[in-house]
Amino acid sequence: MLQISHLYADYGGKPALEDINLTLESGELLVVLGPSGCGKTTLLNLIAGFVPYQHGSIQLAGKRIEGPGAERGVVFQNEGLLPWRNVQDNVAFGLQLAGIEKMQRLEIAHQMLKKVGLEGAEKRYIWQLSDGQRQRVGIARALAANPQLLLLDEPFGALDAFTRDQMQTLLLKLWQETGKQVLLITHDIEEAVFMATELVLLSSGPGRVLERLRLNFARRFVAGESSRSIKSDPQFIAMREYVLSRVFEQREAFS
């Protein structure tokens, strides 16, 4: 379980997050949404251990987070892949740094690529892949170390609508299959409503928890309902419009 208590953080000398209290249970998919500058990415970087926080605590499985760790896998919008390595070696890179024996890490990489639909692409290079395929490699790399918690920072923001829909459904299937805790940062309201089992709305900076919503659209998808059917459901449309109105309230209040 991820537990965040009374978290305060600065960014560039200014308050970025203020009194954040969140819990992410095992098997849940938490989505954080808010206007630009609300501290979404700062929150992910704090959980990942990339930057320090000023007050409060972040704990995963009862252990305080004070730096990066293999129990947290991170996927970025710009992937951060190594262009001089092939796909398989990119996925296996973290395992290599951890001292995993070569044959074992290549087998793990193969299995992760199979999970994300890139079996057979092991020897291709990053420049030979589409944007969506590169994000699949990034997800496979993050999963290779078998983390307890998967963190994703607007991973589909630069993708076209069709590819973004494919990646959303892939991530939900992986979430169901692995049972991992997932925390997704996004600025896309429809994506947030579709994918979250719990949706957290942040206020304009400094970010505070404005509202928490329990949603069931992601569970309906993994139970077999199509994404098209879900997104055309009046309940989904109403929730999307409600969340949109809350985000616009924050934009107007601080404009």
Curated annotation (Swiss-Prot):
**Broad class of where this protein is predominantly found:** membrane
- Top EC class of this enzyme: translocase
Q: Does the keyword Manganese apply?
A: no
Which EC number(s) are documented for this chain?
Answer: 7.6.2.7
Its membrane topology is listed as:
Peripheral membrane protein
Q: Name one GO cellular component term.
A: plasma membrane
ABC transporter domain residues: 2-229
Can you name one GO molecular function term for this protein? ABC-type taurine transporter transporter activity
What subcellular compartments does it reside in? Cell inner membrane
Transmembrane in keyword set = no
- Provide the binding site for ATP: 34-41
Purpose: Part of the ABC transporter complex TauABC involved in taurine import. Responsible for energy coupling to the transport system.
Q: PANTHER family, alphabetically?
A: TAURINE IMPORT ATP-BINDING PROTEIN TAUB (PTHR42788:SF18), TAURINE IMPORT ATP-BINDING PROTEIN-RELATED (PTHR42788)
Protein name in UniProt: Taurine import ATP-binding protein TauB
Q: What is the lineage of its organism?
A: Bacteria, Pseudomonadati, Pseudomonadota, Gammaproteobacteria, Enterobacterales
